[in-house]
């Protein structure tokens, strides 16, 4: 039996040439950082360094920082990434050179109409959307929207009381995932779901499908390894977002818009209505009005960017409060003083709670919403002696930045006092980036913080939080791309009544 097949010389030449071309494609960009004198892990042909993500992106970033220092290079497939943890360079990337060089985020592949979402749009289109949407997230608009958000806070408390009455420990992600979903769907689409008690609601089902991303998903992997396939996928109407969910929400926004126009509900204050108002304003320039497709894209991206991040962040806060009774008690005292006799929370009272702000900020330092901030270099540029070629993705690794002992005393410790009035002025704004910084920071930052704080106030007004036998101490972080605990955070709630 022959081990080597008996092929013609032409076939062998063709096979050898194909393998050589494949190897060249898989390695052509992998010498970039070595040429520039920038350290980093050794890439594997075709795949780059993505296999190093096995223990999680955050762990890879942390290990690289400890090994290579504040600047290193790595590769996702053929795409070069330059990681930076120098505050001066971070400031240049996020702020000073934002409009001229680092305007755009990384493209993740074929996105269909989701390219019209503010987080994924580019250059002039992004500027236009930011200009239109920024007034929607002002303090004044959020204050108007606060009664609607508080309504979902009341639903959260009803659900918590029912769960607490069972006497069983509670899965934090389940309860706060439902709360987060209700707040976002209510404020984005104007629907009341009560997703904890209606998990089969089509709205909830379609929304959760949007959030299912696996780091080694074959389709995503094909986009990472062969970026040239993206326009082909676009032509074939493929998308990284599930088509059924996209069509569902696109149709839903159109229906909701028609219903509101028919019933003349112009006074409702939610994101959908505020976006509709850009179309209805007299004298509104056509380029400043959102199309129906753009409205759908923004509403969907609110779910994509807000649901998991908010619910996971609240769960982390609850874990820290449960395992630090002194911090919990101090925060309860502040809440009780501001809202005696369990008075309903007001927007102004929430915004004035200093210790609550300190606790939330410290939790976001230890457990950042995003593991990285990415910007693509639009041209060759040199910053502080570091040459960055056109097309390089400049990434800021948030986890190691937030735990860097050079900037944070005892960085692994949960210490809200870091963010006290006396101390927070000494924090460099470019080493604490839970929502990014500069013109392209998270537009929904205020909304997310209000959402988190509203939940924390409601819980601590009515319950004491305690660890139980099922609580994982110390907490371990998942290997998934989204920063989250390895297992569910399970805690016990005890009524204060």
From Swiss-Prot:
GO terms for cellular component: endoplasmic reticulum membrane. Gene3D superfamilies: Cytochrome P450. This is Cytochrome P450 3A18. The lineage of its organism: Eukaryota, Metazoa, Chordata, Craniata, Vertebrata. It is an enzyme of class 1 (oxidoreductase). Belongs to the cytochrome P450 family. Heme binds at residue 442. One of its GO terms (biological process) is steroid metabolic process. The gene is Cyp3a18.
